Amino acid sequence: MQKKKKKKRGRKAAVIIIVVVLVLLALGVAYLVLRQIGRLDREASRIARMDMAEETVDRTVYASGGYGQVEDTIKAYMEEYVNTLQAARGVLQEEEFSNLLSADNLEADGPGFEASLAYLEEKQAEADADFEKLLKMAEEEEIMAAIEGKGINAYFRFLYRREMLDTLQPAMFTEEELQTARDSINASIESRRGLLTFLAEQQEHWELVNGRVNFDADE
């Protein structure tokens, strides 16, 4: 009788031990999962808070496994977005753009200004293409297309969607903000193009004297 009780107590103890082990394993897995998700949340929030017009995306991947793939995809996408944004805005900071109306350039490229006008045409096309790309990159369909073909399951696609659409898409520039920036850049390009075109058309009626444009007295 006592042997049977001992056997029952032994089986019960074994069951309890197994249950405890399973619970601990489950808790351990849950902890690891939450830590990985926490890393994704942290990195997405960090990108959302950055000054996208000035800063660069940290491409270090802190998560691992499928979570790491999600983080890498997020950062690759946002790096492309940030680089495109900075390229679109960067034309105004280019030395060549700033020097278009300098005495040195007026003398070197005048009086027809073929190189300067071609440069402005090129920059206009590049800026327009960049702004169109930025608009497209903010669309949900384009965002989700970046994770397709990565060979990861629906769970990780869900995490990607959550980070991108809930945290990062709202941090992207709105259509109105992009249009304002685009108009400002176009206005700067157009003002220089207009002046250089005018000088090219009137090239018989002006000359550069001591770094200044002097027109004929009757002009």
Description of each model-found segment:
Residues K5-K8, Y31, R35, S188:
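General helical secondary-structure elements
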Residues G211-E219:
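Polybasic, proline/glycine-rich intrinsically disordered low-complexity segments
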Residues A14, A26-S116:
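Leu/Val/Ala/Ile-rich N-terminal alpha-helices, chiefly Sec-type signal peptides and the beginnings
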Residues K6-L24:
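N-terminal Sec-pathway targeting helices
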Residues M1-Q2:
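N-terminal intrinsically disordered, acidic low-complexity segments at the extreme N-terminus
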Residues S102, L106-R212:
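Extended amphipathic alpha-helical interaction segments
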